[in-house]
């Protein structure tokens, strides 16, 4: 058996497309909702704890909607964690231009000037960490396997605080 349940939160058509390529495991539950439709929070069992990972999700949402989600998540899952990565406004503007150049323009309204501001979005936030270097998650041996141009790029983004991971506990 499995020690955890994985909830796939996404739009119904995206969930269907995912299942064409990746079979659903026995411990997975699909939640066909938008992240901003807080009804999905009532479908998640928090009995064993909840860790929500939102890679690449918040870029496309307005700040007030993410702030409301952070607060609702914190209220629904005391002791839970929410982890996401994002970019500084300057880097995100560059990302928008890059995406538009390749034919898929998309607005990225989640431009938070202060990476520490989201900890104020909910009274339920108990701890809050920001990591500005994605290589911090790797051992020295693993870092050596990353091509040098990428290590340099990650170092640059760390210096300008251009991309970062937020890890908040409730």
What kind of region is each of these model predictions?
Residues 1-170:
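Alpha-helical subdomain
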């Amino acid at each position: 058996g499995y020690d955890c349940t994985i909830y796939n939160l996404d739009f119904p058509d995206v969930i269907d497309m995912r299942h064409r390529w990746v079979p659903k495991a026995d411990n997975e539950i699909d939640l066909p909702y938008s992240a901003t439709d807080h009804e999905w929070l009532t479908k998640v069992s928090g009995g064993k704890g909840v860790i929500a990972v939102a890679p690449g999700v918040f870029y496309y949402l307005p700040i007030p909607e993410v702030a409301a989600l952070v607060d609702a998540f914190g209220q629904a899952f005391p002791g839970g964690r929410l982890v996401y990565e994002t970019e500084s406004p300057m880097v995100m503007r560059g990302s928008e231009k890059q995406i538009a150049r390749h034919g898929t323009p998309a607005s990225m309204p989640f431009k938070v000037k202060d990476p520490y501001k989201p900890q104020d979005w909910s009274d339920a936030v108990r701890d809050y960490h920001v990591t500005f270097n994605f290589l911090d998650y790797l051992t020295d041996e693993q870092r050596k396997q990353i091509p040098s141009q990428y290590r340099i790029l990650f170092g640059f983004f760390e210096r300008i605080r251009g991309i970062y991971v937020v890890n908040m506990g409730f």
